[in-house]
A protein has these predicted regions:
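Hydrophobic membrane-insertion alpha-helices, especially the h-region
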Residues: 8-22
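N-terminal positive-inside, membrane-proximal cytosolic segments immediately preceding the first
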Residues: 1-6
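N-terminal export/assembly leader peptides and their processing motifs that target proteins to secretory
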Residues: 22-143
Length: 143
């Protein structure tokens, strides 16, 4: 009887330890997601210039590469439900929207030279439903 009680208590203790480890991992993952999101959310409320936008585009491309996000035939990242990031740039002077890949692949240095002092504002921010990570930012040129 005593032996069975010890086995049951031991199993109960192991189960509690497993649940605690799972909760700790879940909390750490949530903290990491919040940290990653804050890197992009800080641009939501303020105006930035072209050089800052170029830096943000480079960061998004690096993140997509790190996460092994595949590209389509045009070289644009294919959005997934977990960790892809897209940045679109809406140019109001010519009424056209450019995906970040087009700017990045067509010489981002040239973009910086041409738009370094132009002001932009984040007009839309979207999140992945599955993970809560940022999925898309849309920046609009200010006049």
């Amino acid at each position: 009887m005593k032996h069975q009680l010890l086995i049951i208590l031991g199993l109960f203790f192991i189960l509690i330890c497993i649940v605690c480890v799972m909760l700790i991992n879940l909390r750490a993952e949530k903290i990491e997601i919040n940290k990653e999101n804050m890197e992009y959310e800080k641009y939501q409320t303020k105006e930035i210039i072209g050089t800052d936008l170029a830096t943000l585009i480079s960061k998004a491309v690096d993140t997509n590469e790190k996460n092994n996000i595949p590209k389509n035939e045009k070289g644009y990242y294919i959005e997934n439900d977990e960790n892809s990031i897209k940045i679109d740039l809406k140019m109001t002077t010519i009424d056209k929207t450019y995906p970040m890949e087009e700017i990045y692949n067509n010489n981002i240095t040239m973009f910086v030279q041409n738009f370094n002092t132009i002001r932009f504002k984040c007009t839309n921010l979207e999140y992945h439903k599955k993970t809560g990570k940022i999925s898309k930012l849309i920046f609009e040129e200010l006049q």
